[in-house]
Amino acid sequence: MTASPSIRDVLDFWFLPLDHPDHGKPQELWWSGPAEFDAEIRERFSAAFERAIGGAFDHWRQSPDGALALILLCDQFPRNMHRRSAHAFAGDAKALEVARVALARAYPAAFNLTMRLFFYMPFQHSESLPDQDLGCALFEAFDDAETMKHAIEHRDVIVRFGRFPHRNDVLGRACTDQELDYLKNANRYGQ
C-alpha cells in the first residue's frame, strides 16, 4: 500500500495500462464489486484516499489526467474500499469540487466516453437536486439508454426523498416510513 501513488498508478489501475488492449473500455468489475477487487483497492489505495480527502493531492486537479485520478480516488475507490460504511461517502465533497473544476476547464473532452463518465459520477452521487440535474444533463450526451436510466433513477430518489435512503443506516440517519417502504425493494447502488 502506498500513500503516494502517481496519477498514472490510479488511472492504470482503474482503466488498465495504456498499452493494454482493454484500456479505457468498460469493466464489469467496476459495478459488480467482487470482494477481491474491493480488497485490492483497499490494499493499494486506502492510505492515499485518506491523504486525498485531506488535500494532499489537490495539485492533481491542474491537469485532465490528474483531475480524473483524483475523482476516482475520492469518489469511486471509497465506494469499494468502504462498502456499506459511512466512510464510503467521505470523499464525495472533494470529488464534487474537483469535478466542478474539471468541467469548468473542459477536461472531460480529452477522454473517451467511458473515461468521461467518471468525471460526472460525483454529480450522480450527490444528494443535491441541482447536482443531480446537472448530472442528468451531462449523461444525456452519452446517448446511451442504460447510462441515462441510472442517472434518472438517482435523480428520482433525490426528488422523492431529498437524500439516498440506502445511506441512512451507515450515516446514522433515521428513515421515514416512506423511506423504509422504498428500501424493501430499492436498488442500493452497491452499498
Question: What is the predicted role of each segment?
Answer:
Residues 1-84, 89-191:
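Intrinsically disordered, low-complexity activation-like regions
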